[in-house]
């Protein structure tokens, strides 16, 4: 009985710490809002064939990737026509392991650079994000 009381006391003491760790790691989408790369001005875009969006700096990409809750059933991946391993991409990106994230994207897609430009991710992976369905704004993927 004494051992049980000691165990229970320790558990009650560390439970708030465990909850804080879980919230900091798994529920970042509550604290960090959705953000997309800024679009270039229309006047400039009409004069060239460059990207529509400005570059998404790696710090912002890491921050947005960290919003992924790594849900049990990744609807983003289910709704991807290539079945890209999106949750793992996001995890690697959030950890700053961009080369590994790129290599992972190449394992299911021979031309991820092209796909990233023409894929309607707002209707596919981002549009089916569990976080989007909960009202917190989708994880920015493309």
Question: Which ranges hold each PLM region?
Answer:
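Ferredoxin-type iron-sulfur electron-transfer modules and their immediate structural context
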Residues: 21-142
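Charged/polar low-complexity intrinsically disordered segments
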Residues: 10, 17-20
């Amino acid at each position: 009985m004494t051992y049980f009381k000691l165990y229970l006391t320790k558990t009650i003491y560390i439970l708030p710490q465990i909850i804080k760790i879980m919230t900091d790691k798994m529920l970042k989408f509550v604290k960090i809002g959705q953000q997309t790369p800024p679009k270039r001005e229309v006047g400039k875009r009409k004069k060239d064939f460059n990207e529509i969006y400005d570059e998404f700096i790696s710090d912002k990409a890491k921050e947005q990737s960290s919003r992924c809750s790594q849900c049990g059933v990744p609807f983003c991946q289910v709704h991807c026509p290539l079945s890209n391993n999106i949750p793992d991409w996001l995890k690697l990106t959030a950890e700053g392991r961009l080369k590994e994230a790129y290599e992972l994207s190449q394992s299911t897609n021979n031309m991820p650079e092209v796909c990233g430009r023409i894929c309607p991710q707002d209707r596919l992976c981002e549009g089916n994000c569990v976080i989007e369905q909960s009202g917190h704004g989708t994880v920015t993927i493309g």
